[in-house]
């Protein structure tokens, strides 16, 4: 038998071409014979037997027993005898392969077979190693989904010769195979894109079969025979319901439901005007039960044969005989509003979107996405049902095509709706794709609940489930009447320690161009890494050569496809330029240029070589007088430093910066080349994400300053990789990146750091030439060039000697350049080469190019300004010389120098605003003068040289920081730029903490502080005082401390002849004296100087204190250890110097004496008084009186170590007396020590959000910021912390400080900037008022806590706010100490105008804020500020509280705002950037971490492992219950509070013992649980939850029992807060489960930030509108029934009478018509007779109408019979002409007519009656061709004419009030402009024309004019007495028509 079978096994590959064609021809011939069904069964029987003997499982079965006569010609393919090359070719052409179950004939079994799919062929064998495969020809393929023996993933393949049933492991696999079969049989196209395949499937018009059974006899639409079997089993098209046999499926023609105009084909009907009519699409037979013919209204359809027709669109059924009488146009059906007619979709344009022509009438297309897996695979039913109701091209399966195809096709629709039929996860998928296509404004999204949870559908009102598809048309009507609401969407930003490389999808289709670009980018990255890391010369040379070749090839390939893109050409040029810079740097390094020369020389040589040598060299961008010289001392210092290892590191850093710059340029070029598909490009480049190159160093070489400024890549491509070390504390402010040296943690991970925590050494790569900018007296900018020491910052000349203060005017004085304020020039024409031009980013060149032409103009003005400035400096020199004698301790030290151009810093010879005594220093930074020349530099600076600093902060900077081995010794007073936030209570590594300080006992002080303030307040103190250590950068050799510098208080009384400008730099004497100081912040390295400069290029930076970097001691579970804090030793002289104010000083001395005599051992009081006055004698006495009587603050600071009292006052007598009478010595016993006030300034706002206030009062009210206890009790009098305080008149658009942009910070994208500007800052504000009253002067005295800080307030409201600003961040005040802030919003010159401390809405005008407020916050939120924190959260026994009815609970609720606002600030959104973060996903519903996410993750894993167990919603709920009970026992998320940290709007929330945290955007969680509690009850603390208020609700989860109980009862004790941003820090090494909208995963340690992303329009169910529409439709139906009844009665009357007899009703209307015509004819004739000047044509028309009227009642009797209707036509025509001519005459000549009053009244009434009667008449053309007149008998009868005659008609024709000036208009003027000018009478006439005269009295009584008419609403009409729904709708519709027209 085996020998007999061998000839039947055809080895196709071994046959010759001739035999191969013969075999195929034989097979095709027999195939055609088989398809005809006429093959005799005689030869088949032995063949079947042979087949069974040959292979027992080769006989397939079907539901119908059908024989396969072509079985003998089954082809088999051998794959081994063709050679390896042939086999590789065959494998390459495989589309899909894998194992499937094949249904066999014997015993209905399933056998596992290996299948291979190629083009038009399918092969299968037992396994992949078989040599021979069976072949199935797919040339005429029919495939469909089926279900056999309860197998839900089976599908059947039918060809003319084979019928095979296959089964996949899952539905996804089945759909993959079906999609592959579709691709294998689709015609080949030049672009093998999946989009084209999907589009072809839409446009092909093919049927989509599935196997089904039928309860009624059903007939095949191909062969017209009945389907076999009792159940009529066969195939049905899921779209058009075409029925066929399985054997006939391949023969069915492609006439499925139309999708586009092309598929309509020859059935297109075009009207004469060119418009296309939608025709009917008929399907024959198989009509539903009880179908009624649309023409004859009789039953149609049959169960005996295939007959009658059914339209696929309007679903009308019709008989074969009645079909010609059917209307041509198809009404489309009940879902007409949602359907996209195929006649409107003309084609698919080049951007893969439909070219759409909107149809006439109402049109709101609906795009439907269905998840076929949702709802126990119920989505398949809804998918088919939607395709039957709508255009099949509107419905997409999310599993097969995803949302992108549908959104792309609908892109050209101006407005459309989206219906997502799935769960919450699929809704998020669709919304993410909407984000990607940026279609938020085009679409409105609705949800149909088919998933398990369906939380979003619940909230939107669509219910919790939808399982029945039979009522889908009614459901669509609900979605058509839905209302729109905005849904907030939140970005889940994640910063992880290790981010894995994303996997490439299995079925990803990549183009050749993308693959080539990816390979080139990868190769370039490898070459760059080798260049930076290698030490081998040959490797370096080869890598460099390969890099150049790769970049050249990359640029050429990209540029040839984008030849016209100018921006791409610029980016390519930048890439080539940066590559040239890298090569130059390599060349200099290799030839040894660094061996004996400084890096500046290298830069100079590089630039000199790159700049073309021309006569006019390129001008300098900074200064034309820069000179780079070397001295012998410089060379000595160079040789000393060359021996250190840091120099090599610096060279490596320079090279690394160059390499990173090239790498960034490559990514910019490639990103720009593919703007259309950014997501695909990101996926392709994900294998080589942008990552800054790092220099490999060992542990010995890793110094704190060894890394340059980090390059922060774009968020969308960053992929940092870090080691997984223990994460014990995470800095909450991801502002910049820092490199730290902690062995356990910070060496292995780079984390974002806040600005106050940021490492100053990050700015080590700084250009060494920095320019000083100073302002002239009249608003000009002056450039100064000074030599600054790299060690201490002193001024040094070229020879290395320090400059004296009087050297400004000498030969060594810097050359001053003045710049016009408006022009801000940067570039000069001098032939000086800028040494930093190549190191400055291209953006700086672009930004300053157009500023370069005006530098050398106005030379005379510059010289005059120099003379004025020099005179000023000479007068200041004397004071500086005196200071120098007292404080300067020069030392001959070798100092490396270079030219430094410091932007925004002016080094002046004298600081006249610094006043020093033995124990206190007062610094006045806001001295004002009456002279016109005085202006603040922070307010006049037109260009703050941010361009220079942008170069510093850019990766282009490669100059390393210089750190000296020798340190200066000495201890003097700190320079004036001091830390405002620091106090005696400072960090152990802070620069303020010198070696003289004594360490506090670790437990005593901190325990006391923690016990009083709590953990969070202690954290606030830590955050306010932590600075970063720079002592590690210094030498270990320290000199002996020196006593502090002294300055006489007599400086207070000295007059200032010339005003001094406020500077951002300390006075020169302070710098020189500070150089030898031990606590000098500048001695720790040049990088700290530049870091200070870098952070102070604008006004905000000038006000902010310097932050030097250090490492604190950390302990697990806390931010910082207690050992990291010390107590500064205050040094106060026992002698009190005399003050200018004798009375105040004497009073204070009395207190001091009392303290020192009575209690020598008790702490003394340090009384500091600040007043809003100038501490000079230049101010007039009037000004002093005015200032001193308004405001003052007195603060007592107790210090245990100080032995005397230090006092400074500047107030007048009324204030002094008040202070003296209220101040008394405070006695205290014990050993405790008082801590001085640590001032936390308010968070600054962006400058452009504050309106400048030129008011003079701003000068007075903005001069106080804070008080600080310095090393010598230094007090700074400062204007403000906010950039815009006391802003004077200037053009703020020309000052970049007020644009909110700072080039030195990391890039702040516009979207994030808008978020920061719209959301309240995370300031410590008080949201509710208290007991202070407006404008009430009184005096308060309070002592709070352990600090014993006393605040004396004698002031107006502004100074009370100032007091609160000082104490607000530290002390939780009771309500009585807080003023009523809502009453203080009137003062625009308030001290806190630019601050967000109290949320005063920035004191801007209401008109400017109105639009933003409406978009940003709802009205309820105006009185409450975020975050709103539950006051019970900080109770130690939370959540184990009572019912909340006790006294403590009531007190907590009463002081909720005060307690909530006192939480320690940890994160300020205004200062936070997202560098290092990437968007993990987007949250729409809720976010969970802990137990809830663990349950969701376990359920997800269970569903993946056993999908058959999770196919129904009931089973899924059961599994959730089981898994929740499991967590009740296991408690895997126990002690979650130890593993995570929670921050709400920057405020740390103390967490109790809990197992999870849930963040809600909607009030529904995990299947309907209301975790937040009842939202209907009014809450005194929280806002009602809503999904459109941009507010999140944070809830604690204590266990699975609480989760279960929340489904039944409303729990509220677990509420944490309401806020606008959330940050969660995950500590430790373990991953924590996290879920977003039900999708769970394990999140590694790191930081998670939840920020507002955008808003999307969602459709919510509107039940009230549904009820109204339903009632209206019912009335319309009743009305149509009555009309039909009347029409039938009229028809019966017509049938009874052979002639058209006038009915009784029509006769009544006819008599009224005759009366109206007669009256009009009469009064028109009288008008013409009375005014002979008028035209006589009107009289002829009146006579003609009168004659026609007489013809219908000759001799006083009406005509009878059909002649009456014919005669009436003439009467109607003549009367209408008379009416029109009369109105035209009155309109044209009315202004000159003077009519009698009675004639005017009667004529107007006649015209009005005629108009109403003409509306009741109609003329119709009958079958015989004659015209006949008919009357509308259903129109309501009018009231008597008396009322109408009392109101003249043509009042509505006039626009004026006087008759002589009236201008007539048409009777019915429907334009909005005309209606707006209507009078009451015209409105009444308008009502009468609508036959609503019963409301005339009401409109007259309420004086409703046209303007009021256009604004009437439903409620207004109800008040006017219009209660009938029909009348209300008619009036509203008419008003709408008036408005639209």
Curated annotation (Swiss-Prot):
InterPro entries, alphabetized: ATP-NAD_kinase_N, C1-like_sf, DGK, DGKD_4H, Diacylglycerol_kin_accessory, Diacylglycerol_kinase_cat_dom, NAD/diacylglycerol_kinase_sf, PE/DAG-bd
Residue numbers spanned by region Disordered: 1030-1068, 1132-1164, 1215-1257, 1276-1295
ZnF Phorbol-ester/DAG-type: positions: 206-256, 279-330
Organism the protein comes from: Drosophila grimshawi
GO process annotations (BP): glycerolipid metabolic process; phospholipase C-activating G protein-coupled receptor signaling pathway
CDD domains: C1_DGK_typeII_rpt1, C1_DGK_typeII_rpt2, PH_DGK_type2, SAM_DGK-delta-eta
Family per similarity comment: Belongs to the eukaryotic diacylglycerol kinase family.
Function: Phosphorylates diacylglycerol (DAG) to generate phosphatidic acid (PA).
EC number: 2.7.1.107
UniProt keyword list: ATP-binding, Cytoplasm, Kinase, Metal-binding, Nucleotide-binding, Phosphoprotein, Repeat, Transferase, Zinc, Zinc-finger
Low complexity composition bias: residue spans: 1133-1155
UniProt catalytic activity: a 1,2-diacyl-sn-glycerol + ATP = a 1,2-diacyl-sn-glycero-3-phosphate + ADP + H(+)
Domain annotation PH: ranges: 93-186
Protein name, per record: Diacylglycerol kinase eta
Keyword ATP-binding in annotation: yes
Subcellular location: Cytoplasm
